[in-house]
């Protein structure tokens, strides 16, 4: 098949252990490389899932911090592009973070980032209450970037509930693939 690119879509269970999650991601990247993939797509919260919002905010790091440097090295060593579906990027203060999709190329450079625009807030009467907006700063920019797959529109999880975002990615930002 002409112009085909093999992509690995990863499903994993993250936990509150950054090192264990990185070890899992590293193993999955090696498996993808052995299978001939050019890009590996990870889910939201691939690097960490905390017991509560306070723990999650505490581990937030800048994009040039040790967690992301590890993933940049992993991309470089494996010679694969990594689409990291939702990283806990440090926010503008100690009480907030950004839920950031990071695209890393096969030489370990961050090619693009997108901070999740649509926050997941739910209040079920007599049931669960979750307010992502209480600890996460929404992004402002719609982002598409060139990759081995073509032009990729970057989004995070709950964004899928907002078709207008995908219309803008396709028609205003010329995205050919949505990630």
For each predicted feature, which ranges?
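Short polar catalytic/cofactor-binding loops
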Residues: 11-16
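Extreme N-terminal starter segment of soluble prokaryotic enzymes
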Residues: 2-7
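Short acidic/polar active-site loop segments enriched in Thr and Asp
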Residues: 38, 175-178
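Cys-nucleophile CN-hydrolase/nitrilase-fold catalytic domain and related Cys-dependent amidase chemistry
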Residues: 18, 27-107, 111-115, 121-122
């Amino acid at each position: 098949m002409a112009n085909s690119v093999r992509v690995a879509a990863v499903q994993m269970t993250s936990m509150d252990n950054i090192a264990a999650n990185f070890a899992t991601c590293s193993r999955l990247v090696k498996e993808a490389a052995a299978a001939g993939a050019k890009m590996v797509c990870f889910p939201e919260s691939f690097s960490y899932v905390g017991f509560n919002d306070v723990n999650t905010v505490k581990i937030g790091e800048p994009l040039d911090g040790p967690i992301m440097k590890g993933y940049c090295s992993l991309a470089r060593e494996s010679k694969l592009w990594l689409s990291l579906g939702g990283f806990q990027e440090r926010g503008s203060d100690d009480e907030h973070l950004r839920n950031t999709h990071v695209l890393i190329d096969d030489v370990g450079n961050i090619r693009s980032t997108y901070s999740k625009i649509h926050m997941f807030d739910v209040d079920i009467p007599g049931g669960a209450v979750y307010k992502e907006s209480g600890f996460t700063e929404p992004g402002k920019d719609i982002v598409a970037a060139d990759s081995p797959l073509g032009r990729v529109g970057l989004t995070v999880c709950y964004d899928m509930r907002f078709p207008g975002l995908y219309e803008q990615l396709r028609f205003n930002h010329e995205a050919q693939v949505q990630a």
